[in-house]
Structures are given as structure tokens and as C-alpha cells.
């Protein structure tokens, strides 16, 4: 029993040590990317997030992801005044998409668990079930240094509460946020 506990403890310590990233150079670091998004309450994060993903007549937003499984915002504000809204996902990390890939998937809040579940087996389609009617829009899966964009009609966000998340297996618990229709 002691050997079993020792093996489990060693495995946990090894995994924890392997998951730590070295400190990013100051030129790459941004305040929003450094702060763990999962620790900040949504109400406190909104003012800083608004600067990262603005709306109010601006019909585009950029969301950054990194090798620490974080988005730099918890709220994407989409203007009702826009005919089309484009979201660009930038992976600021260095790891390849096979080990630390990210995408950005938008769906109704109540549908997101099903989108995650159905996406797990869909590695060939970037962890998004093909033709999933619950998905409003999504980017392709990207690795470090890459970017991808999606374009959506804001009218699709009129009914209900919408969320965005990364559907790469295991990432959605940390990498998610709210899509807010404004104006």
C-alpha cells in the first residue's frame, strides 16, 4: 500500500512539474494574459476584458490563448449594430496543436456540455462535431504562434445566454467565457 501511494505521489509531482512553463519574456507578457482568468470573478474582470474584446461599433475582437490553457478575456462583447462580427484567436504560446492546441467555439450556455462531450471524439475536425447545430461558430484548432478567425452574424446571439470555450480535451474547464450582445 505504501509503494502504491508513493507511486501516485511521484506521478502527481512529476505531472505538476512538467506542466509548469518557464517565465515568459517581458516583451511577450501582457497583464491580461498573466492573470489567471479562472481566479478573477467575472464582475471584476469585465472592465479589463472590455479593452481586450471591445464592441460598440467595432465589429471585430481578438482573443489570445497561451500554453497555460488560458484565454486573456472572459467576455467577448458583440455589437448588435454589426452585420458581421469577426473574432480572431491568437495562440501566443509555442507548443504545437497536437499537445496544446486551442480553438474558440461559441454555443448557447446550456448546450456547451454537449458540445464538449461530442467534440472529444472529433480530433479530425478540431474537436468540434461536424455539422453540430448547437455550435454558432468556431475556429479551427491552432498551435503556438498561429491564429484563426471566425465570422458570425450577431443576430444569431439574440436569444439566450452564449458562451465561448476551447474544446480541446481538458481545456474547457479553464478556457471559457461569456459572449455578450451589446448596444
From Swiss-Prot:
It is found in: Cell outer membrane. Keywords: Cell outer membrane, Copper, Electron transport, Lipoprotein, Membrane, Metal-binding, Palmitate, Signal, Transport. CDD domains: Azurin. GO terms for molecular function: copper ion binding; electron transfer activity. Residues 1-17 form the signal peptide. GO terms for cellular component: cell outer membrane; plasma membrane. It is a lipid-anchor. It comes from the Bacteria. A lipid is attached at residue 18 (S-diacylglycerol cysteine). Its cofactor is Cu cation. InterPro entries: Azurin, BlueCu_1, BlueCu_1_BS, Cu-binding_ET, Cupredoxin. Residues 57-183 form the Plastocyanin-like domain. Cu cation binds at residues 102, 166, 171, 175. Its main location: membrane. Residues 27-51 are annotated as: Disordered. Binds 1 copper ion per subunit. A lipid is attached at residue 18 (N-palmitoyl cysteine). This is Outer membrane protein H.8. It comes from Neisseria meningitidis serogroup B (strain ATCC BAA-335 / MC58).
Amino acid at each position: 500500500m505504501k509503494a502504491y501511494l508513493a507511486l501516485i505521489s511521484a506521478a502527481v509531482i512529476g505531472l505538476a512539474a512538467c506542466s509548469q512553463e518557464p517565465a515568459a519574456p517581458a516583451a511577450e507578457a501582457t497583464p491580461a494574459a498573466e492573470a489567471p482568468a479562472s481566479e478573477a470573478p467575472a464582475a471584476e474582470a469585465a472592465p479589463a476584458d472590455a479593452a481586450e474584446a471591445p464592441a460598440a461599433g467595432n465589429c471585430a475582437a481578438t482573443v489570445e490563448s497561451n500554453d497555460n490553457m488560458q484565454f486573456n478575456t472572459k467576455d467577448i462583447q458583440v455589437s448588435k449594430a454589426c452585420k458581421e462580427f469577426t473574432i480572431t484567436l491568437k495562440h501566443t504560446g509555442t507548443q504545437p496543436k497536437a499537445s496544446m492546441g486551442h480553438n474558440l467555439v461559441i454555443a448557447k450556455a446550456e448546450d456547451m456540455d454537449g458540445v464538449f462531450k461530442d467534440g472529444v471524439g472529433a480530433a479530425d475536425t478540431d474537436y468540434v462535431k461536424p455539422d453540430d447545430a448547437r455550435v454558432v461558430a468556431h475556429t479551427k484548432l491552432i498551435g503556438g504562434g498561429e491564429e484563426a478567425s471566425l465570422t458570425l452574424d450577431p443576430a444569431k446571439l439574440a436569444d439566450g445566454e452564449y458562451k465561448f470555450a476551447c474544446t480541446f480535451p481538458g481545456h474547457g474547464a479553464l478556457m471559457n467565457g461569456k459572449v455578450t450582445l451589446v448596444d
